């Protein structure tokens, strides 16, 4: 390339060669495309010819097979013709025998016609029997229908009576529940009346006690109650020691002789004024089914375990001056009575629930159908 293009301009010869090469490539590509398309067409024609050859071979095989089948059919037809000729000979002999049988049948027919009169009489008799049997069948069918109707009526009656029994059981249960509720309300009202009675009695006794005590004692009692708001067994002797040591216990209006007089008050006055009502309420609660007895001297914040034994029960102070004043005890009494009534209602509700549950279990154990059957048998 360098030697040929040394005496010419650079750049013209390579472009011409490139154009020639492109033309040659295009011609070769066109020739290749035309040859390949022709080759494809020829291959398709060869495939079609091969398919035609296969179809002709298959048709030839079918024709040969059909020819052999036709030859076999010709042979079989020939055999059948021979067999039919033999059958014809036998049928002719049978026909002759049948003609003889026909003659004998005609003779038998005459005999049977003679017996028809007797058979007609028998048929008439059998028809009469059939009519009687049909009537008997209809009568029995009517009886069966009546029995079925009676059975359905009895079943419905049994179901109705069982339903009525169930309704009566429900009504009796409702009445029983209402009676239990009425008894519970009556019991609570009686408890309230007794509590009010004992309250009034306690108030009357308190009035008499207040009139019997001198005027200077309540002032000392108020001072002692302020010191003994948390009732404990340790506060009682401590309060007494303070009163004895100080003489007037910090109050100038009270002297030692007044304290001596207060200590000489009878033992009945030293008891709390609501001890009767508390004692009666304690007795009422102890007789309840599930209630636990409350101590009359028990303070509301005393801890009680589930077995009813008080762990750390704080008793009311035994200070005689404080017991003579009805203020704190009368304030605590309505709360104690309210707690007593609450506990009684809870116990009553628990007993009512248990009774209701026992009634339901008893009714579930008793089948209403058996009860209805028993009632039905008694009615029959």
From Swiss-Prot:
Residues in coiled coil: 35-195
Sequence segments annotated as region (Disordered): 192-254, 280-380
Membrane topology per record: Single-pass type II membrane protein
Gene3D superfamilies cross-referenced by the UniProt entry: 1.10.287.1490
Topology feature Cytoplasmic, residues: 1-14
Protein localization: Membrane
GO cellular component terms, A-Z: membrane
Polar residues bias (residue ranges): 305-321
N-acetylmethionine modified-residue sites: 1
Residue ranges with Basic and acidic residues bias: 192-212, 227-247, 344-380
Source organism superkingdom: Eukaryota
Segments crossing the lipid bilayer: 15-35
Residues recorded as bearing Phosphoserine in the entry: 233, 275
Positions on the Lumenal side per record topology: 36-380
Family of this protein: Belongs to the GOLM family.
Identification of the protein by name: Protein GOLM2
Source organism: Bos taurus (Bovine)
